[in-house]
Amino acid sequence: YRQAALANECGTPMLRAMMLEFPDDPACDYLDRQYMLGDSVLVAPVFSEAGEVQFYLPEGRWTHLWHNDELPGSRWHKQNHNALSLPVYIRDNTLLALGNNDQKPDYAWHEGTAFQLFHLEEGREARCQVPAADGSTIFTLKAKRQGNTIAVSGEGEARGWTLCLRNIQQIAGVQGGTQTGSEWGVVVSAQGNTLTITL
């Protein structure tokens, strides 16, 4: 929903041709069977009855949103999917918000938000905005990495949010929250709006 609000504010489409997001990659110029959902999520629909799909990942490392497998970029990949799955890959240095209600689309998105952090690199900062129903931003979460420390800070109103460090199964410690394990990676439950995570 935030991407739809941004499209209204800035004019950049929510569903983007690959060449729009990766203008310097010649391989993206003619791709018409996959697209970017916003600036960080790549979607490759399955057009084959057998479930076979070929798709191209631009430069970098990409993580599947649900399966959590990692694939290298700058190359083509071939996979098989069923009716309940498809390639949905997330770029590194992405902070993504997942909701906590799969029964209806309209609810308080800032309550129980499950943030997902995908491979934040040294010196990089990731940001995620959670919208209210009117499209305005009700909560903004930022994560910045310096060395082995990730500083996380939130601004605005949010309740019961968590942060999952995708494909990181162990951390040295956390200040400002508690940690638990999951199949996707360490999940940190925030006690306030700031966290300091030591990898």
Which role fits each region the language model picked out?
Residues 1-158, 162-168:
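Catalytic core of carbohydrate-active enzymes
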